[in-house]
Amino acid sequence: MHNKKVTKDEKKNTKTKDVNEHIPNYIKNLPWYYQDIDKNSKNNSKEQDYLRHHRQRRDDKTIDIDNNDQAKIGTGIKDEFEVIVENKKTTIDGIIKRRKDEKDWDARKDRWYGYSGKEYEEVLKKWEKSREDLNNTTEESAYDTDEEIEMMKLGLTPKDLEQNIKGSSVRLREDKAAYLKDIYSSTTNYDPKSRLYKSDDLGSIDEHSNMFLRHLTGEGKELNDLNKFARENAKESGIRDELVDADKVNHVLVANPTKLEVLRKQKELDSLKLTEEQNRQEQRKLKRKAKLLKKKAKKPKGTPQSDSTKAQLMDMYG
């Protein structure tokens, strides 16, 4: 290790004590807020400790370090208080007086401590008022508006409620449960787990999986139709599942949903145009046939010849 150079100030301040050269500068040097105090201090003697800013107990009281080990005397209760009135400090003489509490510890720990009898009297008055209001109410106003509306819908009156007359059953006797249809049938169409009765209106049984599948409706049906169109379009373009093809990505529904949807709409429009054109051509053919039929020779119309006239003509012209 290289020996550190000692400054001139350190040599002056350390005539009697040797300076430890191994102490770093950030420990040895005084901070900026201590240097001003050191210059103004009266005990700025020649023989000063260069590590005095680290000492807890010193002879000179230039630097005050907070030491919690030593006992301290508090300032005590002040009789004068500073009050700011219109941006000016003024002192007010005052004496802090403690309130005399006549109640002892047992009184303060009592369960009814701080509770007055006047509050309970007010509660009793409220209860009496509520009882009087209930007694003064008539039978018509006893029911709430929501209850009255519900009773009107059910066709009931307050007298019916008193007599406990039950309304007619909402469900008819002819309305039987769906699972009762399987009692005398060989096949079970009711699934108790899904609570679904298998019928042709709701769905059909798949031949491959032998499972009952519901008929798709709404967006599910549209997505299924679009998936079928994507598969057919891929087959038309020569793409197969067993072969590896880079163009296969362009015909996948998940990768190109909007593209295939637009393509399907375009093909539907083209098919509509073709059907319209075919219908027009058929109408033209029918019109041509009608014109040709009008131009053909018509059978003569007149009175038929009698047998005598026919015989005379045969004799004359052979």
UniProtKB/Swiss-Prot annotation:
Disulfide bonds: none annotated. GO terms for cellular component: Prp19 complex; U2-type post-spliceosomal complex. Residues 1-21, 274-284 have a biased composition (Basic and acidic residues). Residues 1-22, 37-62, 274-318 are annotated as: Disordered. InterPro entries: Slu7_dom, Splicing_factor_SLU7. Associated with the spliceosome. This is Pre-mRNA-splicing factor SLU7. It comes from Candida glabrata (strain ATCC 2001 / BCRC 20586 / JCM 3761 / NBRC 0622 / NRRL Y-65 / CBS 138).
